[in-house]
A protein has these predicted regions:
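S-adenosyl-L-methionine-dependent methyltransferase catalytic core, i.e., the SAM/SAH-binding region
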Residues: 1-324
């Protein structure tokens, strides 16, 4: 392992969370010392620190909607050529405009909840701790407890099925509605135990039975898939020609969305097959940097089990995307 990357990993790991696929991400983005880069999901600054450390005359813009993450990132990036801004990555174009930056050389989005958020009981993301059922990344707006208390059985089942791919969505939703008529569901352990009681015993042997339900509620509370869909085109538009967009996902719904959008940008001619020559004149707006998604090495899997489901995809912009 490169000693520079190793030292960056050690610094990036300290005190907040361990950035996943760090080496693969840096290699995919091909950081130029004088380049301008944007980390749309700074978290505690793990990836951001590694990027900013490579800049000489360049600049990093680090965004996150979580005020806790912004404080941690600000401390970690102090003294480096980095600007830290509290904002959802869907607004990256507006942030860049306010900073007087027309386009950037590379963008990183590390989608999903951070290890710090999972490990902070009071944030209510984890079924391992007894805490308020919150799950808000921005610490404002509707909580998971609000959804559990107000949505109908059908609405809850739809969320569990769509965002968690939970095959026992209906019985779980039914149990929630019945339970809340007796007592409000306010904590993570209340919900986790209720889910566990709602699925067959065989389903409890394949990981924690509440995992998919918690994932689904988190996605719904934060509008994660809607945000990602909107951010993909915005991010591509913010790149210079030759700029690169790297995205790390942690579950199949996110990865499928990224894969599909990348494929759209890579599509060239759209003429019917029976046409002998191209008349549309379209050429690919992007080309793949990685032939297949990068995943964690055995070493990283040993050191950081949470990297198991991480996938990195990256494309390079050739020209502006087609908008029809």
């Amino acid at each position: 392992m490169d000693s520079n990357v190793n030292s960056q990993r050690q610094r990036a790991d300290s005190g907040y969370h361990r950035p996943v696929l760090l080496e693969q991400t840096l290699e995919a983005l091909q950081i130029r010392p004088d380049g301008v880069y944007l980390d749309g999901t700074a978290g505690g600054g793990g990836h951001s620190y590694a990027i900013a450390s490579r800049l000489r005359g360049g600049r990093l813009i680090a965004l996150d909607q979580d005020p806790d993450a912004i404080r941690a990132a600000g401390e970690r990036l102090a003294g480096l050529p980095a600007t830290v801004v509290q904002s959802n990555f869907t607004h990256m174009d507006g942030v860049l405009q306010q900073l007087g930056i027309a386009a950037v050389d590379g963008i990183l989005l590390d989608i999903g909840v951070s290890s710090h958020q999972l490990d902070a009981p009071e944030r209510g993301f984890s079924y391992h701790y007894d805490a308020p059922l919150d799950m808000r990344m921005s610490q404002s707006g509707t909580t998971a407890a609000d959804l559990v208390a107000t949505l109908s059985e059908q609405q809850l089942a739809d969320i569990f099925r769509r965002y968690g791919e939970e095959k026992f969505a209906r019985p779980i939703a039914r149990s929630i509605v019945r339970q809340r008529d007796k007592q409000s569901i306010q904590t993570t352990l209340q919900l986790a135990e209720l889910v566990s009681q709602s699925v067959p015993a065989a389903a409890r042997r394949d990981g924690h039975p509440a995992r998919r339900v918690f994932q689904a509620l988190r996605i719904a509370v934060n509008g994660e898939l809607d945000c990602l869909s909107a951010a993909l085109d915005t991010a591509f538009d913010c790149l210079k020609p030759g700029g690169r967009l790297a995205i790390i996902t942690f579950h199949s719904l996110e990865d499928a969305m990224v894969k599909e959008r990348f494929a759209q940008w890579r599509q060239g001619c759209i003429c019917p097959r029976e046409f002998p020559v191209c008349v549309c004149g379209r050429t690919p707006a992007a080309h793949p940097v990685l032939k297949k998604p990068a995943t964690a090495t055995p070493e990283e899997l040993r050191d950081n089990p949470r990297s198991r489901s991480a996938k990195l995809r990256c494309v390079e912009k050739c020209h502006d995307r087609y908008r029809d």
